[in-house]
UniProtKB/Swiss-Prot annotation:
Gene Ontology molecular functions: 14-3-3 protein binding; GTPase activator activity; protein homodimerization activity
Region (Disordered): 63-88, 102-186
Protein name per Swiss-Prot or TrEMBL: TBC1 domain family member 22A
Keyword Phosphoprotein among UniProt keywords: yes
PTM-bearing positions, type N-acetylalanine: A2
Gene: Tbc1d22a
């Protein structure tokens, strides 16, 4: 009994701190300097009977700060944080969040920017966070949880908590001598673009360009100044060795014009006149009209398409191939023009010799592209038929509701997705977006054939809300054939590609996932 009493007294007297002891945890959401909160927490803590101990002096905030100055140092708690970070999330929550982000982004992009001439209000002194009533235990949200309104949102009487309001005055720091967030963002963007451009130039200038590294760097977009050379390398038109490139260019250009001299004069022969006539009819229907309707450009496109059709009798000329010439030609011609708008490039100021070389480069790069998707344009176009079927199965797995909605209104995938495969989405996107899309296609293995399938799936699901709102076959088909992408930019394409990559990662190596 005596030993039991001693053991009992021992546990009563033990006040040493051990790992796992219950202590109050303070953070940005629960500041230790809030007297009301501190008192509330102390009152809500149940008292444990202990032996009388000497009262401790109340710690000041300076002591608290010094005692917790190493709160962010690496310690044993890091393992718990890493474990929490690796916990799997609910797939439905992830999908819903992704769709909501894409939808909100689209709504912000579709709203025209409105400039007001009202003077900006003078900055008001930063107010301290309001103290909650004594009966209300709700706390002010932390910076990461507070809602920052978009410029398009209407402001009411209640002002959401901003970052500068939730931090002490000393934490509000002005960077680069300016407080304008837009100026800071533009400056950071400019520095990042300059850095990426330097990386491209270093890769391209080396004696032997590392094509694998070039593909990785090109996936997220290629800067305009280095895009022509990068496309020629990624398409396989030019060799990686710098010293061999001039000779290869000269040889290929000479070979192309030998084809023209040999074949082009036969365009009006009975055996070829139908092909040439169809090309002559299709070119004025292409876009952008400001470029295509220039006589020099029309002649260049006619020669490129006719020579390709003659040299590839297995497929010949098929409508849709003509659209694939435009991105290459525009990218190569922009190297010699200062106009930023790719839809309105004027070739009248480009020397004739330069135009000849661009024509040859365009032909060979387009030929390299078509070599990988030629089954799309052979008899009955089996490649497109197969890809449309795969798209239908893929969409039925990733968004069954959209799939059932289309099927319930008797909308067949061939009715809208055939053009997506035949023209590689060129009729659905502005030319500037197509060029950005092709940056990634050329850096992806089988980008124009395999990865394009996942881009089409992400593109269809991107319009989920609008599709589900349509309740009529004609309205559904009209919407799917005229998608509102006129205001899209590189950021929209990047979001589309990111979603497509996620789908590829989930389904590409698991073909059984296509089927239920």
């Amino acid at each position: 009994m005596a030993s039991d009493g001693a053991r009992k007294q021992f546990w009563k007297r033990s006040n040493s701190k051990v790992p796992g002891s219950i202590q109050h945890v303070y953070g940005a959401q629960h500041p230790p300097f809030d007297p009301l909160l501190h008192g509330t927490l102390l009152k809500s803590t149940p008292k444990v009977p202990t032996t009388p101990v000497k009262a401790k002096r109340v710690s000041t905030f300076q002591e608290f700060e010094s005692n917790t100055s190493d709160a962010w140092d690496a310690g044993e708690d890091d393992d718990e944080l890493l474990a929490m970070a690796t916990e799997s999330l609910n797939s439905e929550v992830v999908m819903e969040t992704a769709h909501r982000v894409l939808r909100n982004h689209s709504q912000r992009q579709s709203q025209p920017s409105q400039k007001t001439t009202e003077p900006e209000p003078e900055p008001q002194p930063i107010a301290e966070p309001p103290v909650p009533p004594s009966g209300d235990l709700r706390l002010v949200k932390s910076v990461s949880e507070s809602h920052t309104p978009c410029p398009s949102e209407s402001t009411g009487d209640t002002v959401p908590l901003q970052r500068s309001q939730s931090l002490p005055h000393s934490a509000t720091v002005t960077l680069s001598g300016t407080s304008d967030p837009h100026a800071l963002a533009d400056s950071a963007l400019s520095k990042r673009e300059t850095s990426r451009l330097d990386k491209f130039k270093q890769l391209l200038a080396g004696p032997n360009t590392d094509l694998e590294e070039l593909r990785k760097l090109s996936w997220s977009g290629i800067p305009k100044p280095v895009r022509p050379m990068t496309w020629k390398l990624l398409s396989g038109y030019l060799p990686a060795n710098v010293d061999r490139r001039p000779a290869t260019l000269q040889r290929k250009q000479k070979e192309y014009f030998a084809f023209i001299e040999h074949y082009y004069s036969s365009r009006n022969d009975e055996v070829h006149q139908d092909t040439y006539r169809q090309i002559h009819i299709d070119i004025p229907r292409m876009s952008p009209e400001a470029l295509i309707l220039q006589p020099k450009v029309t002649e260049i496109f006619e020669r490129i398409l006719f020579i390709w059709a003659i040299r590839h009798p297995a497929s010949g000329y098929v409508q849709g191939i003509n659209d694939l010439v435009t991105p290459f030609f525009v990218v190569f011609i922009c190297e010699y023009t200062d106009r930023e708008d790719v839809d309105k490039v004027d070739v009248s100021s480009v020397p004739a010799e330069v135009l000849r070389n661009i024509e040859a480069d365009t032909y060979w790069c387009m030929s390299k592209l078509l070599d990988g998707i030629q089954d799309n344009y052979t008899f009955a176009q089996p490649g497109i038929q197969m890809k449309v079927k795969m798209l239908e199965e893929l969409v039925s797995r990733i968004d069954e509701r959209v799939h059932r909605h289309l099927d319930g209104h008797e909308v067949r995938y061939l009715q809208f997705a055939f053009r997506w495969m035949n023209n590689l989405l060129m009729r659905e996107l502005p030319l500037r977006c197509t060029i950005r899309l092709w940056d990634t296609y050329q850096s992806e293995p089988e980008g124009f054939s395999h990865f394009h399938l996942y881009v089409c799936a992400a593109f269809l699901v991107r319009w989920r809300r609008e599709i589900l709102e349509e309740r009529d076959f004609q309205e559904l088909l009209l919407f799917l054939q005229n998608l509102p992408t006129a205001r899209w930019d590189d950021q929209d394409v990047s979001l589309l590609l990111a979603e497509a990559y996620r789908l590829k990662f989930a389904f590409a190596d698991a073909p059984n996932h296509y089927k239920k």
